[in-house]
Each structure stands twice: as structure tokens, then as C-alpha cells.
């Protein structure tokens, strides 16, 4: 636990010394979200527009993968060099071959996340049946709401563990390639299911994610007018910065716990 706290302090220190990087990453994420929002409103009135929507979706996916690869590369580079801040050039430190690996990782991750999403949706739909079965077996009333909360806790644990595994896998993949990463996949999974990697993800989601959710859902009472839109933009912007900060903190903590700083050569 002591090593985990040291890692978290280092990650927070790096982020505190890199405010410009955080703002740039948040701005890129905002532009990506704006593009995705515009894509959702594309009409489906012709085959040409459907083709445009397909190309647009592929471009959005490619940009998202570049975003994830940039954060992972910068995090690993900062961790291995024992850096005190994230340099802008490290965000573009991945090669074309590494980007193709990241694209393959993104496609596999999308399939895994979709399978988990629909599986959890199926379990949520059967919460009432589970509550009825438990009521029948225990002869005591079991609320489906309570069953749903238990399902939610289990799902969050799986989401955090799975997210840590995917981020760690990406970091290994970009640095070491497919062969070495596949060889270490079981060890990566064990580390992310329990240990420093899991707690880093829990801290990231619990602190940064909760603060972002509170800001995004907070509705202060203001007079209708320009200030109403201003406070909304400020809240959403701050929430987005917190989301990006949480992702960066998670990535930095994983990189620091996985890769040791490179030792300088001895004479």
C-alpha cells in the first residue's frame, strides 16, 4: 500500500505540473464530442449520406484511438524517465506501427465492452426475477431495488478491473509489441483484478469521476439569460477536465506501477 500511495503522489505531482497538457487534452476531447454529436444528427435520406456517416464514424474512431495512444505513450514515457511533468512532444511519441497496434487494441476493446454492456443489461433486466427467487428461497421479502444495487456494485468492480486491464494491455502493447504482451496477459489480468492497479482505477473513478458527475448534474439557481449558459459551459468544461484528469491519473499510475524508471548507463 505504501508503494501505491507513493505512485499516486507522483501521478498527482506530474499532473499538477502539466496544466497546459490537461487543458489541451480536454479541448481535444471536447472537439471529438462535438464531432460525435454532429454525426448523430446526420440524416439517413440517401446512400451518399450513409457513406458519409460511415467515413465520419471511422474518422472519429481513429481520432479516439490516437487520443488513447497519446496518453498511454506520454504516461509510459514520463514513468520510465522518472519525469516531473508531461512534455507536449511525448503525446506524439508513438510510431505508425504503434498506432496500428493501438487500432487493433481499440477494435478488440470495443467488442469486449459491448459484450459486457449487453450482459450487464441482461442481468439488470432479470433483477426482479432474482429478487423473486431469493424471496421464495429465504421466505423473506427481498427488494429488486436492493438486488439492483448489488448488481451495480459487482458491475462497477468488473468495469474498473476490466478498464485497468485494457489500459495496462495498451501500455504493454505500445512499448513491447504483441508477442511479449500476449505472454504477460495473465499476469496483467491478475494485477488489475486486485492490487495497486485496481485501487488506482477505483480512486480515479471514485474521486475524479464522482466530482465530474456532481458538476455535470449540478443545477444552480440562476436568472435566465447569458449567465445561465455561461455557468453551464463552465460546469461542463470543468467536468470534462476532471474526466480527462482521471483518465490521465489512472494511466500514469498504471505506467508507474508497471514500468520501472530506466536506469542511466554506468561507465
Task: Please tell me what each predicted stretch does.
Residues 1-267:
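Hydrophobic alpha-helical membrane segments
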Amino acid at each position: 500500500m505504501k508503494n501505491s500511495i507513493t505512485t499516486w503522489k507522483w501521478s498527482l505531482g506530474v499532473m499538477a505540473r502539466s496544466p497546459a497538457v490537461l487543458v489541451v487534452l480536454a479541448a481535444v476531447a471536447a472537439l471529438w464530442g462535438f464531432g460525435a454529436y454532429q454525426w448523430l444528427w446526420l440524416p439517413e435520406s440517401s446512400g451518399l449520406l450513409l457513406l458519409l456517416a460511415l467515413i465520419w464514424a471511422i474518422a472519429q474512431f481513429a481520432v479516439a484511438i490516437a487520443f488513447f495512444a497519446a496518453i498511454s505513450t506520454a504516461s509510459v514515457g514520463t514513468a520510465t524517465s522518472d519525469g516531473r511533468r508531461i512534455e507536449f512532444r511525448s503525446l506524439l511519441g508513438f510510431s505508425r506501427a504503434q498506432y496500428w497496434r493501438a487500432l487493433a487494441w481499440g477494435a478488440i476493446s470495443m467488442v469486449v465492452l459491448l459484450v459486457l454492456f449487453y450482459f450487464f443489461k441482461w442481468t439488470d433486466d432479470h433483477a426482479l426475477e432474482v429478487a423473486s427467487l431469493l424471496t421464495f428461497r429465504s421466505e423473506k421479502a427481498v427488494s429488486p431495488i436492493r438486488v439492483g444495487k448489488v448488481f451495480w456494485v459487482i458491475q462497477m468492480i468488473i468495469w474498473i478491473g476490466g478498464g485497468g486491464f485494457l489500459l495496462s494491455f495498451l501500455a504493454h502493447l505500445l512499448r513491447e509489441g504483441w508477442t511479449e504482451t500476449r505472454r504477460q496477459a495473465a499476469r496483467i489480468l491478475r494485477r488489475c483484478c486486485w492490487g495497486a492497479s485496481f485501487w488506482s482505477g477505483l480512486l480515479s473513478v471514485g474521486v475524479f469521476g464522482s466530482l465530474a458527475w456532481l458538476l455535470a448534474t449540478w443545477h444552480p439557481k440562476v436568472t435566465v439569460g447569458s449567465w445561465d449558459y455561461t455557468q453551464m459551459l463552465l460546469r461542463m468544461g470543468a467536468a470534462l477536465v476532471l474526466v480527462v484528469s482521471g483518465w490521465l491519473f489512472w494511466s500514469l499510475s498504471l505506467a508507474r506501477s508497471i514500468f520501472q524508471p530506466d536506469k542511466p548507463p554506468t561507465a
